[in-house]
Amino acid sequence: MQKNAAHTYAISSLLVLSLTGCAWIPSTPLVQGATSAQPVLGPTPVANGSIFQSAQPINYGYQPLFEDRRPRNIGDTLTIVLQENVSASKSSSANASRDGKTNFGFDTVPRYLQGLFGNARADVEASGGNTFNGKGGANASNTFSGTLTVTVDQVLVNGNLHVVGEKQIAINQGTEFIRFSGVVNPRTISGSNTVPSTQVADARIEYVGNGYINEAQNMGWLQRFFLNLSPM
């Protein structure tokens, strides 16, 4: 009976230790939804005997002679030049000081006995002080550079373009994901069909990965459980 209990205890211990390697990573994607968009089909062209066919889509059949090639329809592509360089610092300090002092005296011999024992007095003095000093500081910086070609998935009523895109790079046993979304003003698009990420409104840039390297950087769920319970 004791051998069975010891055997069960050993198996339970090994099971608990093995669970420390399991990691559940709760993460919410910063860029949600589809990361690509298909062009919208236009009306079926009808032959009218003219050289100019107005029913043809602008970018997929008819291209004006003096019109640029900037994206303006759903499904058009645009290259985002990632130029993110953000730094922030914060410091604070506080000082407080308070001092107090009290002094008073009283007779130790009753008045009717002062002629016999003399006038004896006692002095009592009390003082106190309180001092507080506090300082704090924080620094943060991040740099992100590169290029990513995105797709127009929505044309807003004011002409701005909502773009979204994703790039996947497989390296050995892991995969890196770069996702981007934001609102682009067509006036900021250069002649080479590029726009810097610093001129994109509501930009969402996400750089994540999966694989054993990413898993090794995360704490197991059981370790996190004991970490939350630890008073230290």
UniProtKB/Swiss-Prot annotation:
Q: Does the keyword Acyltransferase apply?
A: no
Residues carrying lipid (N-palmitoyl cysteine)? C22
Lipidated positions (S-diacylglycerol cysteine) are C22
Q: Where in the cell is it found?
A: Cell outer membrane; Bacterial flagellum basal body
UniProt keywords (A-Z) are: Bacterial flagellum, Cell outer membrane, Lipoprotein, Membrane, Palmitate, Signal
What GO molecular function annotation could you give as one example from this UniProt entry? cytoskeletal motor activity
Q: Does the keyword Ligase apply?
A: no
Q: Name one GO biological process term.
A: bacterial-type flagellum-dependent cell motility
User: What's an example GO cellular component term for this entry?
Assistant: bacterial-type flagellum basal body, distal rod, L ring
Per the UniProt entry, the signal peptide is: 1-21
Q: How does it sit in the membrane?
A: Lipid-anchor
Q: What is its main location?
A: membrane
| PROSITE patterns, per database record | PROKAR_LIPOPROTEIN (PS51257)
Q: How does it assemble?
A: The basal body constitutes a major portion of the flagellar organelle and consists of four rings (L,P,S, and M) mounted on a central rod.
Q: What does this protein do?
A: Assembles around the rod to form the L-ring and probably protects the motor/basal body from shearing forces during rotation.
**Similarity-based family:** Belongs to the FlgH family.
| Annotated PANTHER family | FLAGELLAR L-RING PROTEIN
Name assigned to this protein: Flagellar L-ring protein
**Gene encoding this chain?**
flgH
